[in-house]
């Protein structure tokens, strides 16, 4: 059985760079150098803990993807990557390569969809897949068998985490976010439906489809959801990860060979 380790690269790098930019506020070159060194240390620790047979780092594209084409306000207002870091990504990718880790960089697809595409066939064939990320959006993939490790908080984002955080099953998370929206992505949910109400509705009805089809007589919250059907369905589409992107390589290309 193979064990693929996936690094959500910018999720890791941007958090490291944020710390280093505070420690070297007036020196962008020092920020990048410190980010590079700290990233390498972090990745070495991750490799030692995970002991993978295969590994890849996945980077986001800067180009607008299908979500932006579908919904023009997608991720509006999000803090842009600092220019110095953007210009230094090639250096960081070279450092990863020296550690034995290739980088997947798409011109058109978001890292989240690329990761979901990597995960799907491997877990279906009983291979182990561990993702290093703090992004809770990946928890929608937990039922597939994916393991998610939050490196910074030293915790697993697993079924128990989802139950504690949301009171739901991983399979219900897409519908949960379709109701509440996701502010960090500027995805709108149903006005007046917060996390507690969304959890209650999904605990009772199971899925967004059942919520939209249910008899809403004498249930104002349900009426509210049904009045915002199109908002919910758009958010559901935007939140759900695509897992069918042609990648052009296979598992054997990702075999991890530690540097000599």
UniProtKB/Swiss-Prot annotation:
EC number of the protein: 3.1.-.-
UniProt domain 5'-3' exonuclease: residue ranges: 168-258
Binding site for Mg(2+): 112
Statement: the UniProt record of this protein carries the keyword Oxidoreductase: no
SUPFAM superfamilies with a match to the protein in the record: 5' to 3' exonuclease, C-terminal subdomain, PIN domain-like
GO terms under biological process: DNA replication, Okazaki fragment processing
Location of region: Interaction with DNA: 192-197
UniProt keyword annotations, A-Z: DNA-binding, Endonuclease, Hydrolase, Magnesium, Metal-binding, Nuclease, Potassium
Sequence positions that bind K(+): 179, 190, 193
Pfam family, one: 5_3_exonuc_N
Cofactor: binding comment: Binds 2 Mg(2+) per subunit. Only one magnesium ion has a direct interaction with the protein, the other interactions are indirect.
Keyword Ribosomal protein: no
Gene Ontology molecular function, alphabetical: 5'-3' exonuclease activity; 5'-flap endonuclease activity; DNA binding; magnesium ion binding; potassium ion binding
Cofactors: Mg(2+); K(+)
Function: Has flap endonuclease activity. During DNA replication, flap endonucleases cleave the 5'-overhanging flap structure that is generated by displacement synthesis when DNA polymerase encounters the 5'-end of a downstream Okazaki fragment.
HAMAP family assigned to the protein according to its UniProt record, in alphabetical order: Xni (MF_01192)
The protein's name: Flap endonuclease Xni
Source species of the chain: Tolumonas auensis (strain DSM 9187 / NBRC 110442 / TA 4)
Gene: xni
């Amino acid at each position: 059985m193979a064990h693929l380790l996936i690094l959500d690269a910018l999720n890791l790098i941007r958090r490291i760079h944020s710390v280093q930019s505070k420690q070297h506020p007036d020196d962008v070159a020092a920020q990048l150098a410190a980010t590079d060194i700290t990233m390498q240390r972090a990745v070495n620790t991750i490799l030692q803990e995970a002991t993978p047979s295969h590994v890849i780092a996945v980077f986001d594209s800067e180009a607008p993807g299908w979500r932006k084409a579908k919904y023009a306000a997608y991720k509006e207002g999000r803090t842009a990557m600092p220019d110095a870091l953007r210009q230094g990504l090639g250096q960081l990718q070279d450092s990863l390569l020296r550690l034995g880790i290739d980088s997947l960089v798409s011109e058109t697809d978001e890292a989240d969809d690329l990761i979901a595409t990597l995960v799907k066939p491997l877990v279906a064939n009983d291979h182990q897949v561990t993702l290093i990320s703090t992004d809770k959006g990946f928890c929608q993939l937990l039922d597939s068998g994916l393991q998610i490790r939050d490196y910074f908080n030293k915790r697993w984002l697993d079924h128990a985490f989802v139950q504690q955080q949301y009171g739901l099953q991983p399979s219900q998370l897409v519908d949960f976010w379709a109701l509440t929206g996701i502010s960090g992505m500027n995805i709108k949910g149903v006005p007046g439906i917060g996390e507690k109400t969304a959890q209650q509705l999904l605990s009772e009805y199971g899925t967004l489809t059942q919520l939209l089809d249910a008899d809403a007589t004498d249930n104002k919250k349900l009426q509210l959801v049904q009045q915002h059907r199109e908002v919910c369905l758009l958010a559901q589409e935007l939140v759900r990860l695509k897992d069918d992107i042609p990648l052009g390589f296979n598992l054997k290309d990702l075999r991890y060979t530690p540097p000599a």
